[in-house]
Amino acid sequence: MKKIFWAVATLLACAGAQAQSVVYKVDPSHTRASWEAKHFGTSTNRGQWDKTDGEITLDKTAKTGKVDVTIDMASINTGVPPFNNHLKSPAFFDVANHPTARFVGDKLKFDGDKLVEVSGDMTIRGKTNPATLKAVAYNCYMHPSLKREVCGGDFETTIRRSAFDVNWGVVEKFTADDIKVTIQVEAVKQ
């Protein structure tokens, strides 16, 4: 009986040792968040935030982890400087008082080895709401120059901007309330 106990204990200890979280640092040169919104119900306005930061923790064996991405809201870029300034103003994102947006998710869903979605909380303009980022693409590879594993993909969600108190033009339907957000991310194993 003792032999069986020690065999089971050793097996459990080895299984626990194999499951291990790995930290990946977001690569800002390969990570950005972009958005799309209908303008007066006709064309689509698009823009992106050029500066992001964050960390991803993955345990591929246990299929668990955490995603924490921060967006510098002052880095918004539509290609039209007056529009950028309008979006930074108190009418929209109020960047002076809310300089960052953040997504933190710890509910990861896998299909086999592929990450298919991350659920958590999105904070914009000081308001936090649940959000689920669905993977459009996801992969890990050994980076030829860095000689380290890089994981990344394209993740999409649709948010209702009024839920974050970004209300300018919603009633008048100048710009849609539902905004498609895509986060393109690559993160380097530390």
PLM features: what roles do these ranges have?
Residues 19-190:
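Low-complexity, acidic/polar, glycine-enriched regions of mature
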Residues 1-4:
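Positively charged n-region of N-terminal signal peptides that target proteins for export
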